[in-house]
């Protein structure tokens, strides 16, 4: 196959919604067929003259052992031999037309006299030229007959139209024959699904055959009106007089041959019925896909290839989707309209016969074109527009303004000022406390023993912290969705995001960490659960977090041979306290994989990818601002030097020496001190001696 000379480029689009809603409309049409070029062949020396081989008797006898095949118009395409040629023979009966002109009548009489000789030459021509054309019915090989039988509509000029959804399977003829058989009870869900779709395609073919039989047999019954494709026969410019029917034989061929009309049944779904267009998806074998498919699968792309069975599998469209970035790559790019048929495919056979097809496809769902250069500029423009729309632009008071205009001007200014203040009126954390919001994303998991995994997580908050969340919603523990057919050597894209908000007291120490525990569980087709591994990560609440994704190595207990048999045949999860296993404060010894105790050895399994982000919020310490403006001079002489005043301000504004100055903080400190005094007095009264109690009573 040779690609056309048109420029093909890869279209890159950003998918804003669900990729499963993507639909393509593809149109394919047979344009034309190129006949073989003229051929000059040497038939061998023939000694038919009386002067010997080296001395021909006449000028015409020079060319008697040579003949040429010249392609003519469509009306003469085929000839007697049906090879797609109009043969001009240079022999004694016809003569050398380049040097001698003869009338058509005399030429026809000469042809009738030399009919036997022409029959012999025709046999020689059919043996020497094994080329065939799709335009010829008599000389078409069995493969061409089968292609024409399956795709009569396409060969007769109809446009194949099909709509393909994302990851929608369309079978080729070989796949249809493979999945039409009953897969049995041990088949997978994918095989059963393909078998069901193959039966639907078979029913579509049988329904079409019944329509054809009804159209031929029942003449009085009202049947769907057939489509009539009429074509004007091209005639030669100079019509020869007295030419018999033998000079222009009539043959049956395709639409580009000499045919006046072809009747076919109206079938808009003939592309799906004839398996003309088929697709290859992620579930199919990589051996059927192009060479770059395995490399794309390793990078996490989802692939889809669209082929056309044009006497050989021809790749029309290749689509790949990056779920991490949300980008869709389409090669070649979408046409402005599927009816434009922008792309051309040229099919070459072993002989000089060529088939020309054109196709176009468009997207029927909205997509946003992705441009790296214009994306930032467009975003900046949108931000400026939002800022201008959200906040009124400052305007000046007109010089000659009436009283009503002045009142309206200041009213708008007050509304704008209140709107600006409302932007800062968000909920603050309690005093002497800090709010920490953690944004967690469990991205993917891979290299576990079994597929169909999901992850359960649990967070353990440190001391001097309080969980802050929506009532009835517990984000400290949860589970992800199950990834079907992923998690072993295939990457399971979990994509689970959640948020945890904590309040930290003043007594919180930076060494106190938030512990995050993971348990990876697989579920097989019999709904048996198996533990695939445990993981742990300690999150600091006050210090910085890594900006990149974190790769966590999962482990699980190795166990003995009985545990291995139970895991394989029965499944289930062992009672393993992984929280205490990862707690370093409760252990006096280090874990080792070389421990001979069967309860202690662990084995590594797969990995999890975790991404963290953190937001901190606290109230502004007003003591620094207060001491910055009002500093106290306690027993120190003031000097006029500016440097000494600045030093006094810095010393007085030190957080270690500063005290609470607001009324709320003073009252809170007073209440706390009163509680401590009452508690101390209560303890002292209980432990007092009887003599001291007696003296207190007398007093």
Curated annotation (Swiss-Prot):
InterPro entries for the chain: C2_B9-type_dom (IPR010796)
GO biological process, alphabetically ordered: axoneme assembly; ciliary transition zone assembly; cilium assembly; non-motile cilium assembly
Subcellular localization: Cytoplasm, Cytoskeleton, Cilium basal body; Cytoplasm, Cytoskeleton, Microtubule organizing center, Centrosome, Centriole
Key word Cytoplasm present: yes
Domain C2 B9-type: 434-560
Pfam families referenced in this protein's UniProt entry, alphabetically: B9-C2 (PF07162)
Subunit structure comment from the entry: Probable component of the tectonic-like complex (also named MKS complex), composed of B9d1, B9d2, Cc2d2a, Mks1 and tctn.
Protein name as catalogued: Tectonic-like complex member Mks1
Species of origin: Drosophila melanogaster (Fruit fly)
Gene that produces this protein: Mks1
